[in-house]
Amino acid sequence: MLTKSRLQVFHELHCLNFLRKLIYPDVYGKIDYKGQIHANHCIDHIRRIAECGSNATPVVYTGYKNGNLYSEPETYTCRNFTLIRQWAEMKKIQNTQ
Protein backbone atom coordinates (compact mmCIF):
# COMPACT_ATOMS: atom_id res chain seq x y z
CA MET A 1 0.00 0.00 0.00
CA LEU A 2 1.33 3.43 -0.95
CA THR A 3 1.38 5.90 1.93
CA LYS A 4 1.47 9.57 1.07
CA SER A 5 0.57 12.57 3.15
CA ARG A 6 0.79 16.33 2.82
CA LEU A 7 -0.60 19.38 4.53
CA GLN A 8 -3.96 20.61 3.32
CA VAL A 9 -2.45 23.94 2.22
CA PHE A 10 -0.43 22.14 -0.47
CA HIS A 11 -3.55 20.38 -1.75
CA GLU A 12 -5.31 23.76 -1.88
CA LEU A 13 -2.44 25.33 -3.84
CA HIS A 14 -2.37 22.34 -6.19
CA CYS A 15 -6.09 22.81 -6.90
CA LEU A 16 -5.71 26.54 -7.53
CA ASN A 17 -2.83 25.89 -9.91
CA PHE A 18 -4.79 23.18 -11.73
CA LEU A 19 -7.76 25.52 -12.21
CA ARG A 20 -5.45 28.36 -13.28
CA LYS A 21 -4.06 26.16 -16.04
CA LEU A 22 -7.61 25.49 -17.31
CA ILE A 23 -7.92 29.17 -18.20
CA TYR A 24 -5.03 28.82 -20.66
CA PRO A 25 -5.74 25.72 -22.79
CA ASP A 26 -3.53 27.06 -25.60
CA VAL A 27 -0.58 27.00 -23.22
CA TYR A 28 -1.30 23.96 -21.02
CA GLY A 29 -3.54 21.92 -23.31
CA LYS A 30 -7.15 20.88 -23.01
CA ILE A 31 -8.24 18.44 -20.35
CA ASP A 32 -9.82 15.04 -20.85
CA TYR A 33 -12.67 13.44 -18.90
CA LYS A 34 -10.41 12.57 -15.94
CA GLY A 35 -9.23 16.18 -15.94
CA GLN A 36 -12.85 17.37 -15.78
CA ILE A 37 -13.46 15.14 -12.77
CA HIS A 38 -10.30 16.56 -11.18
CA ALA A 39 -11.45 20.14 -11.92
CA ASN A 40 -14.85 19.46 -10.33
CA HIS A 41 -13.10 18.04 -7.26
CA CYS A 42 -10.89 21.15 -7.01
CA ILE A 43 -13.81 23.56 -7.35
CA ASP A 44 -15.76 21.70 -4.66
CA HIS A 45 -12.69 21.51 -2.43
CA ILE A 46 -12.05 25.27 -2.65
CA ARG A 47 -15.76 25.93 -2.01
CA ARG A 48 -15.56 23.87 1.20
CA ILE A 49 -12.44 25.75 2.29
CA ALA A 50 -14.24 29.08 1.82
CA GLU A 51 -17.30 27.86 3.71
CA CYS A 52 -15.30 26.32 6.56
CA GLY A 53 -13.02 29.33 6.90
CA SER A 54 -15.93 31.77 6.54
CA ASN A 55 -13.76 34.88 6.37
CA ALA A 56 -16.17 37.55 7.55
CA THR A 57 -13.88 40.49 6.74
CA PRO A 58 -15.99 43.16 5.02
CA VAL A 59 -14.98 43.92 1.43
CA VAL A 60 -15.64 47.57 0.60
CA TYR A 61 -16.06 48.29 -3.12
CA THR A 62 -15.32 51.92 -3.82
CA GLY A 63 -15.93 52.11 -7.53
CA TYR A 64 -14.19 51.43 -10.78
CA LYS A 65 -10.60 52.04 -11.86
CA ASN A 66 -9.70 51.46 -15.50
CA GLY A 67 -13.03 49.72 -16.04
CA ASN A 68 -12.47 47.18 -13.25
CA LEU A 69 -14.33 46.97 -9.96
CA TYR A 70 -12.00 48.18 -7.25
CA SER A 71 -12.00 47.24 -3.57
CA GLU A 72 -9.99 48.74 -0.77
CA PRO A 73 -7.05 46.58 0.32
CA GLU A 74 -7.85 44.32 3.26
CA THR A 75 -5.53 43.72 6.18
CA TYR A 76 -4.56 40.09 6.73
CA THR A 77 -2.58 38.37 9.42
CA CYS A 78 -0.88 35.45 7.74
CA ARG A 79 1.06 32.45 8.93
CA ASN A 80 4.68 32.22 7.82
CA PHE A 81 4.33 30.01 4.74
CA THR A 82 8.09 29.52 4.40
CA LEU A 83 8.26 28.05 7.91
CA ILE A 84 5.23 25.85 7.25
CA ARG A 85 6.81 24.50 4.07
CA GLN A 86 10.11 23.82 5.86
CA TRP A 87 8.32 22.08 8.74
CA ALA A 88 6.27 19.96 6.34
CA GLU A 89 9.39 18.89 4.46
CA MET A 90 11.04 17.75 7.70
CA LYS A 91 7.92 15.86 8.87
CA LYS A 92 6.75 14.30 5.61
CA ILE A 93 5.68 10.68 5.61
CA GLN A 94 7.74 8.46 3.38
CA ASN A 95 6.40 5.53 1.40
CA THR A 96 6.43 2.63 3.86
CA GLN A 97 5.91 -0.04 1.22
Curated annotation (Swiss-Prot):
Keyword hit for ATP-binding: no
GO molecular function, one term: oxidoreductase activity
Motif HXXHC 1 positions after renumbering to this chain: 11-15
EC number per UniProt: 1.-.-.-
Entry keyword annotation includes Chaperone: no
Pathway linked to the protein: Mycotoxin biosynthesis
Gene Ontology process terms (BP): mycotoxin biosynthetic process
Keywords, in A-Z order: Oxidoreductase, Virulence
Short motif HXXHC 2, span: 38-42
One Pfam family of this chain: UstYa
Role: UstYa family oxidase, part of the gene cluster that mediates the biosynthesis of the secondary metabolite victorin, the molecular basis for Victoria blight of oats. The role of vicYc within the pathway has still to be determined. The pathway starts with the processing of the precursor vicA1 by several endopeptidases including kexin proteases as well as the cluster-specific S28 family peptidases vicPa and vicPb to produce 7 identical copies of the hexapeptide Gly-Leu-Lys-Leu-Ala-Phe.
Family: Belongs to the ustYa family.
Database matches in PANTHER family: CYCLOCHLOROTINE BIOSYNTHESIS PROTEIN O (PTHR33365:SF4), YALI0B05434P (PTHR33365)
Domain notes: The 2 HXXHC motifs are conserved in ustYa family proteins and might form active sites.
Protein name: UstYa family oxidase VicYc
Organism field: Bipolaris victoriae (strain FI3) (Victoria blight of oats agent)
